[in-house]
């Protein structure tokens, strides 16, 4: 089995070395970047499986780099940052981060979250879960299981971040069934739901913007107040 490769994007050398040591102790190959230029260079030359990134970086900050990353690749992304206000967390998740941890962090919690994301990112895992399918069709749209993309009725393709793809795959596999936030978060990230965790709601809001004519009054992914969500699309 190929050793997973983790890219740490962090400008503080002490923190970067700490993260490198933590992940290497878990058996991962670790690459380091202190800014966006180095990040893109490493991504272009190595098959990275997970990115762990700070927000406060020299030059382009982590939020801008995450947006660029999402336009190019569908990699698991964890923000690890000293910025702990709710606005930054929601914005990070809106852009497409799969997880968000604040400093100071618990090394054990970080490695567990990283391991869960890597497990769900393995190509064979996606193939096992799709039972030989290449796509799902619903309401004129298509979820491509190979490219992890949503394709419009006109043929335009939108690459989905890992968490959005996992949520959509779960919805398409379970049409019409109530999905609790606990179930969705477990499918998306592998972690348990905690109080005030809005990861699922933010991810659903991003997904709805793709295909709901009126995202605030959706008719494909319905909100079941106090319980969760239900996918009401017409699966073909």
From Swiss-Prot:
Keyword Nucleus (UniProt): no
GO CC terms: cytosol; protein-DNA complex
4-aspartylphosphate sites (modified residues): 54
Domain of life of the source: Bacteria
Ranges where the Response regulatory domain occurs: 5-118
Keyword Transcription: yes
DNA-binding region(s) in UniProt: 133-233
SMART domains linked to this entry: REC, Trans_reg_C
GO biological process: regulation of DNA-templated transcription
Post-translational modification: Phosphorylated by ArcB.
GO molecular function (one): transcription cis-regulatory region binding
Pfam families noted in UniProt: Response_reg, Trans_reg_C
Subcellular location: Cytoplasm
Keyword tags: Activator, Cytoplasm, DNA-binding, Phosphoprotein, Repressor, Transcription, Transcription regulation, Two-component regulatory system
NCBIfam families hit by this protein: PRK11173.1
Biological role: Member of the two-component regulatory system ArcB/ArcA. Represses a wide variety of aerobic enzymes under anaerobic conditions.
Protein name: Aerobic respiration control protein ArcA homolog
Organism for this UniProt entry: Haemophilus influenzae (strain ATCC 51907 / DSM 11121 / KW20 / Rd)
Gene, per the UniProt record: arcA
């Amino acid at each position: 089995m190929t050793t997973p490769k983790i890219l740490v994007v962090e400008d503080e050398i002490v923190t970067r070395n700490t993260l490198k040591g933590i992940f290497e102790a878990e058996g991962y190959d670790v690459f380091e970047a202190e800014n966006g230029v180095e990040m893109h260079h490493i991504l272009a030359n190595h098959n990275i499986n997970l990115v762990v990134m700070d927000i406060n970086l020299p030059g382009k900050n982590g939020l801008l780099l995450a947006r660029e990353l999402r336009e190019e690749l569908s990699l698991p992304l964890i923000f690890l940052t000293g910025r702990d206000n709710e606005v930054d967390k929601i914005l990070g998740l809106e852009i497409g981060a799969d997880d968000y941890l604040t400093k100071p962090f618990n090394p054990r919690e970080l490695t567990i979250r990283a391991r869960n994301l890597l497990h769900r990112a393995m190509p064979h895992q996606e193939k096992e879960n799709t039972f030989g399918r290449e796509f799902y069709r619903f309401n004129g749209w298509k979820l491509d299981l190979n490219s992890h993309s949503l394709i419009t009725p006109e043929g335009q393709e939108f690459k989905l971040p890992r968490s959005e793809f996992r949520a959509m795959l779960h919805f398409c596999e379970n049409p019409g069934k109530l999905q609790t936030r606990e179930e969705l978060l477990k499918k998306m990230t592998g972690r348990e739901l905690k109080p005030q965790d809005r990861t699922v709601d933010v991810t659903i809001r991003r997904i709805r913007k793709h295909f709901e004519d009126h995202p605030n009054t959706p008719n494909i992914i319905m909100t079941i107040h106090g319980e969760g969500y239900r996918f009401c699309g017409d699966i073909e």
